[in-house]
Regions:
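Conserved "right-hand" nucleotidyltransferase catalytic core of DNA-directed polymerases
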Residues: 2-106, 171, 183-186, 195-400
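Acidic beta-strand-to-loop metal/phosphate-binding motif
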Residues: 59, 131-139
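Short, glycine/acidic-enriched loop or turn micro-motifs at the edges of active sites
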Residues: 64-66, 140, 162
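Nucleic-acid-processing active sites and adjacent nucleic-acid-binding tracks
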Residues: 102-134
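Amphipathic alpha-helical transducer elements in NTP-driven molecular machines
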Residues: 117-120, 173-177, 222
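Phosphate- and divalent-cation-binding pockets in alpha/beta enzyme and binding domains
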Residues: 141-148, 307
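Alpha-helical scaffold elements adjacent to nucleotide-binding pockets in ATP/GTP-utilizing enzyme cores
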Residues: 142-145, 175-179
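Conserved beta-strand -> loop -> alpha-helix junction used to position metal-binding or nucleic-acid-contacting
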Residues: 152-169, 176-178
Length: 400
């Protein structure tokens, strides 16, 4: 049967500020169709997959945490993923709760490594049922977390990130809360509460958060994902994109397998490359300091601007941002070097080239290798509108 869109009203308006108060939380913020499951069997007994055109679906998500292991200590069979970007990215290794939504209710189940994830594994009755299609937002991440504890997903799978990028490639954000906000019945207040609690208490490990807050946050994630799917999935037929979407899902599963297998690293070569690039970077940095006449933070636009002015560079040659800060990107430095014979500008470009190669392709790959000598990069399927794929965390060569 066709899915009828939810008539529940939105729980939060954009921009509303929420904070977690344990004394009033349940009274003010409880959601009657959100539950913490006491056992896997409770979910199995109560879940009735929602249907679209006779096809059965459920939505799932995982909440995860990092182990204390360094990347080169990660054992075979466990693939580390990362949350966030750049240097602020946090490693994630194992799930501590799994949430499932059937369009009417959402359940969150907790389990631990000490219990050998025996309760989670009982959910195989759902995850390994090929007649039930499984939906997630950033499916590969959650699939890795499940396989890290020897759980498998069988049957067709769906990713609302890929789905929503096909239905509208010009969205300003593909975060779940931002996509779901346009649909009646969305619930995003718990994410704001979680962020506020994280900032106030300086806690990054979600296992340390109040249980009721995590449960509602996790249940809201699968509920919002459900809303996005039932509203956006029909658009594939409307826009003539269903065949393309199905191809993208097959590709996603293949990319997941490639991530899982990993890329073997020549450790001897990487170690030699790391040493050579470190020497080139250090020499380039020393040459900059020698011409500047002092040591400064080469990566600081403000400090670099001051050095350029002290060396006699005309202030009018250095453009500003809209906020008035000096710009010292490669285009500005190339112009100073080629058109105005500013020799230190070329030295800075050389330093940046070697430093990027060092941190990205030598240190990044060498330091993130697993115990079996492989790197398990994240293959980005939807980052570029041109269709080009890339591999990050650690960065590897661009994929055609």
């Amino acid at each position: 049967m066709a899915v009828i869109k939810s008539k529940r009203r939105s729980v939060i308006k954009k921009g509303t500020n929420f904070s977690y108060n344990p004394e009033s939380f349940n009274k003010e913020h409880s959601v009657d169709f959100f539950h913490e499951a006491k056992s896997a069997q409770e979910i199995i007994d109560n879940m009735v997959p929602f249907e679209i055109n006779g096809r059965k679906f459920i939505v799932f998500d995982t909440e995860t945490y990092p182990t204390p292991l360094k990347s080169n200590e990660i054992p075979n069979g466990l693939v580390r993923r990362w949350v966030g970007s750049g240097k602020s990215a946090k490693p994630q290794d194992l799930p501590f709760c799994i949430s499932i939504c059937d369009g009417k209710s959402a359940y969150t189940l907790h389990d631990t490594l000490d219990n050998n994830y025996n309760e989670f594994r009982k959910l195989a009755a759902i995850f390994e049922d090929p007649s039930i299609e499984k939906i997630a937002h950033n499916w590969k991440f959650d699939a890795h977390m499940l396989q890290n504890i020897n759980m498998r997903i069988k049957g067709k799978v769906h990713d609302t990130v890929v789905l929503t990028k096909l239905t509208d490639e010009n969205r300003s954000s593909y975060q779940l809360k931002d996509i779901a906000r346009k649909y009646e019945g969305h619930i995003v207040k718990f994410e704001y509460m979680l962020d506020a609690y994280k900032n106030t208490h300086k806690i990054a490990d979600y296992r340390m958060f109040p249980r009721e807050l995590i449960n509602n946050y996790a249940n809201a994630d699968v509920w919002n994902c459900y809303l996005v799917f039932i509203n956006e999935f029909p658009l594939l037929e409307k826009y003539g994109l269903m065949s393309l979407y199905e191809n993208e899902m097959e590709l996603m599963v293949a990319l997941y397998a490639a991530e899982r297998y990993g890329m073997k690293v020549d450790l001897d070569y990487e170690k030699q490359l790391k040493t050579e690039l470190q020497t080139l970077t250090d020499n380039a940095e020393a040459a900059i300091y020698e011409e500047a006449g002092k040591i400064f933070n080469v990566n600081s636009s403000k400090q670099l601007y001051e050095v350029l002015i002290n060396l006699g560079v005309d202030d009018r040659l250095i453009p500003r941002t809209d906020k008035g800060s000096p710009q010292t990107n490669k285009y500005v430095l190339s112009d100073l070097s080629e058109k105005h014979n500013v020799t230190i500008a070329n030295k800075i470009l050389e330093y940046r080239k070697y430093e990027k190669l060092l941190t990205t392709y030598a240190v990044g790959i060498y330091d993130q290798r697993s115990a079996e000598g492989k790197v398990h990069g994240n293959i980005n399927q939807t980052e570029a509108t041109t269709g080009r794929m890339s591999i990050t965390k650690p960065a590897q060569r661009r994929a055609a």
